[in-house]
């Protein structure tokens, strides 16, 4: 039966498009993000590592933004989306945004589905999309933009 097991969904789920590997992973804690980046580096040592973090909950971002930044600094280029607030309200966390993470990482940038074309300049890359929120909205935007 093991040969029929395809692994857990949203744990380093890969899709190859040309010379780019898109990875979908549920990583939403700095330790999990570190594991995804390490796996990507080991599996694709010759590819540029370009993670996209989708921070989940405002409180987690506030608590761990420096830890996220320290882990993500190991990548070649980093993109961070807006925080997915889930059940939380931004008004309860003044001053907390994904910019906390971005400002800690030299060269890091904000990204959204409208800004997905920023990823097209990364050739021969592995792009892990990481977070609790299903990143299909970003991955689909990436693919749709390629077809234009």
Feature-to-residue mapping (PLM):
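ATP-dependent carboxylate-amine ligase
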Residues: 1-148
